[in-house]
């Protein structure tokens, strides 16, 4: 499986940060292809203007239709005319791990990173297939959300992470938060590593990890527990967690 991503951005240099770590490894392995198109390169006036004042007044500037449309046209000429366009915006639906898993099978994709007060709505109506948000907060532009989505998709590609089970055991993969992790030394001040993790009993370790995952999810994200149908074993483990924590 190979992930092919195009990004429409006024700041393509920001994506140089992705050349490190897991994503950098995927790029070197040719598991990920990442290309950027700058709308400023498609502006037709001498000043290469990409924004203008909003109709109706108000603060800030709005990204213009034409430079964005031409940048998208160039991206689709390379990636394919039917390539889906995803606009990263706080007005979009909330991005979840389940959606990320879907998106890696929808490659190639074009990610549209807006700036300023937003994008001319007519561009969104004409060119955008989906709108996604990474959370209920505001950033200076869509570049960081685009990088979040690229990172989340890339780490699901087979062979990109160091261990084949790394992605499958992440938070949200099973609809639960991750369990606690420990490494050497065995004791720091008065905080030892839980003895079960030193036992070598893989069944007991798996049971402990699931119990901690269930308990941590209940403590921090009850919405995830409430939308999940717990098995008898999971409910028993959650009850044990409550007893041990009280």
Curated annotation (Swiss-Prot):
GO terms for molecular function: tRNA (guanine(37)-N1)-methyltransferase activity. The keyword ATP-binding does not apply. Belongs to the RNA methyltransferase TrmD family. One of its GO terms (biological process) is tRNA N1-guanine methylation. It is found in: Cytoplasm. Signal peptide: none annotated. Keywords: Cytoplasm, Methyltransferase, S-adenosyl-L-methionine, Transferase, tRNA processing. GO terms for cellular component: cytosol. SUPFAM superfamilies: alpha/beta knot (SSF75217). Pfam families: tRNA_m1G_MT. This is tRNA (guanine-N(1)-)-methyltransferase. Disulfide bonds: none annotated. It comes from Coxiella burnetii (strain RSA 493 / Nine Mile phase I). NCBIfam families: PRK00026.1, trmD. Homodimer. It catalyses: guanosine(37) in tRNA + S-adenosyl-L-methionine = N(1)-methylguanosine(37) in tRNA + S-adenosyl-L-homocysteine + H(+). The lineage of its organism: Bacteria, Pseudomonadati, Pseudomonadota, Gammaproteobacteria, Legionellales. Its EC number is 2.1.1.228. The gene is trmD. S-adenosyl-L-methionine binds at residues 114, 134-139.
């Amino acid at each position: 499986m190979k992930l092919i991503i195009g990004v429409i951005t006024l700041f393509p240099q920001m994506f140089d940060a992705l050349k490190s770590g897991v994503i950098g490894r995927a790029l070197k392995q040719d598991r990920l292809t990442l290309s950027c198109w700058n709308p400023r390169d498609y502006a037709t006036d001498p000043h290469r203007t990409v924004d203008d004042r909003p109709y109706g007044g108000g603060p800030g500037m709005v990204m213009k239709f034409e430079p964005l449309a031409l940048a998208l046209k160039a991206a689709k000429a390379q990636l394919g005319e039917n390539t889906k366009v995803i606009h990263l915006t706080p007005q979009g639906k909330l991005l979840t791990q389940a959606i990320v898993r879907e998106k890696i099978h929808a490659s190639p994709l074009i990610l549209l990173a807006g700036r300023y007060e937003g994008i001319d709505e007519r561009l969104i109506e004409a060119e955008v297939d989906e709108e996604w948000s990474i959370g209920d907060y505001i950033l200076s532009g869509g570049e960081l959300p685009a990088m979040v989505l690229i990172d989340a998709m890339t780490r699901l590609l087979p062979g990109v992470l160091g261990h084949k089970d790394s992605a499958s055991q992440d938070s949200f993969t099973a609809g639960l938060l991750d369990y606690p992790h420990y490494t050497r030394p065995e004791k720091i001040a008065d905080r030892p590593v839980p003895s079960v993790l030193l036992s070598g009993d893989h069944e007991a370790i798996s049971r402990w990890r699931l119990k901690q995952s269930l308990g941590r999810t209940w403590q921090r994200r009850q919405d995830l527990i409430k939308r999940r149908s717990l098995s008898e074993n999971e409910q028993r483990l959650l009850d044990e967690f409550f007893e041990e924590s009280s």
